[in-house]
Amino acid sequence: MVALRLIPCLDVAHGRVVKGVNFVNLRDSGDPVELACRYSDEGADELVFLDIRASVENRNTLVDLVSRTAKSVKIPFTVGGGIDSVASINDLLRAGADKVSLNSSAVRNPDLVSKSSREFGNQCIVIAIDAKRKINKTDEWEVYVKGGRENTGIDVLSWAKKVEELGAGEILLTSMDGDGTQNGYDLHLTKSVANIVNLPVIASGGAGCLEDIYDVFIEGRASAALLASLLHDRKLSLREIKTFLLDKKLPIRPCE
């Protein structure tokens, strides 16, 4: 059985790790390289580094920061934010990233997904989907871009299926409604996407306790759980989380 993954997320703005609630009210959570090293040493399976201001400010993710971070860790590393060309993807992979995450640029230019998948292999291409539940709808979500500031009107489930057809290797699915709240993942959203694609789905947005993480693997059918506030605030450690999940007989890589 393929091991389930725990993935700390480093949201970066202006060179610092930040975290907010529902994509707003950002607060400083530390230096990205220091946090990357800490989580790598503590037993993270992978890392995700997202420059959350890049798409808004129309600038590329800082390759230097990616390089310094990647050189400091020994685990797979995904980088995203403002990546809008095959050349940019090449630069980031050469700088040390194992994968790249495409979001706004994939919606704007779907051909970028297929081109980059052919060029670098679909294992390198992660599609990030920022999903928000439609008002008064229990099972319909829309895709947001530009750091969660712009509603595309695109149905999340349709888009997930489309990016799979285009050649994506993985989906990073964020519930904007749950982001930073620590009230639990959106299990209905996660399961709905996981059920219609044959791709690993990384669940993001809302982890607040050990049971939330267990639930997103069992009920949400996620292949990986993204963790941010829970770890940055030191509410739980990766060792505590992994010990809990291993006791529940889930296929998790133990901390060394």
UniProtKB/Swiss-Prot annotation:
The active site is at residues 11, 130. It holds the Pfam family His_biosynth. GO terms for biological process: L-histidine biosynthetic process. Keywords: Amino-acid biosynthesis, Cytoplasm, Histidine biosynthesis, Lyase. It comes from the Bacteria. It catalyses: 5-[(5-phospho-1-deoxy-D-ribulos-1-ylimino)methylamino]-1-(5-phospho-beta-D-ribosyl)imidazole-4-carboxamide + L-glutamine = D-erythro-1-(imidazol-4-yl)glycerol 3-phosphate + 5-amino-1-(5-phospho-beta-D-ribosyl)imidazole-4-carboxamide + L-glutamate + H(+). It is an enzyme of class 4 (lyase). The keyword Lyase applies. InterPro entries: Aldolase_TIM (IPR013785), His_biosynth (IPR006062), HisF (IPR004651), IGPS_HisA/HisF (IPR050064), RibuloseP-bd_barrel (IPR011060). Pathway: Amino-acid biosynthesis; L-histidine biosynthesis; L-histidine from 5-phospho-alpha-D-ribose 1-diphosphate: step 5/9. It is found in: Cytoplasm. Its main location: cytoplasm. GO terms for cellular component: cytoplasm. The keyword Amino-acid biosynthesis applies. Disulfide bonds: none annotated. Its EC number is 4.3.2.10. One of its GO terms (molecular function) is lyase activity. Heterodimer of HisH and HisF. IGPS catalyzes the conversion of PRFAR and glutamine to IGP, AICAR and glutamate. The HisF subunit catalyzes the cyclization activity that produces IGP and AICAR from PRFAR using the ammonia provided by the HisH subunit. PANTHER family: IMIDAZOLE GLYCEROL PHOSPHATE SYNTHASE HISHF, IMIDAZOLE GLYCEROL PHOSPHATE SYNTHASE SUBUNIT HISF/H IGP SYNTHASE SUBUNIT HISF/H. Belongs to the HisA/HisF family. This is Imidazole glycerol phosphate synthase subunit HisF.
